[in-house]
């Protein structure tokens, strides 16, 4: 219902990874023309191909009778220089440029632990996970880890991610975060503090947990 109220013909929609976003296809309104779906990060097929942003793009573009574009590179590369080299490719640069023109972004919000898709992707070594704990990381959006204040610079490995810079999400008219469950409350709050989402879709239990968390931190 909400998507139906905000989508317009010719919109460009950025899509993150995860099953929650893929399920949006179940409720897809079909009355829109020329919707374009693009992945907000490279491939994460190591964890489960159905979670991969490129796969989610395929799923949604089919459901909405739109067009899907793809980012056929790893979500995380081993060196920043590798990322710079990849960015010179026309097909990748085209996707990166499209991030400046997003009308809607659909992103999941993960927790910074082994239950999250980011940590289960196989891209993060045990050393990197330990670094995340030391840096007090609390959540992720599109594999970018952030702390409770929404800061991403706390985790140096974010620079090796091939995908949208979270600061670009701040300029998207509808940056929709989708997450549920009490354990996601701190991560959601960090995402809100960082300004990466301006719409939240969650459940009642998580909403109550967020309210309690805010009350505790403000007292």
Residue ranges and their predicted role:
Residues 1-30, 37:
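Helix-turn-helix/homeodomain-like alpha-helical modules used for DNA recognition
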Residues 9-11, 33, 102-103, 173:
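Short coil/turn segments at beta-strand junctions that form active-site/ligand-binding loops
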Residues 15, 37-39, 70, 177:
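Structural beta-sheet core signal
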Residues 18, 40-42, 73:
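Beta-hairpin (beta-strand-turn-beta-strand) motif
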Residues 29-31, 192-193:
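Short, surface-exposed basic-aromatic patches at helix termini and helix-loop junctions that form
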Residues 34-44:
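Catalytic or ion-translocation cores adjacent to nucleophile or general acid/base/metal-coordination motifs
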Residues 44-219:
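Conserved phosphate- and dinucleotide-binding cores of soluble alpha/beta proteins
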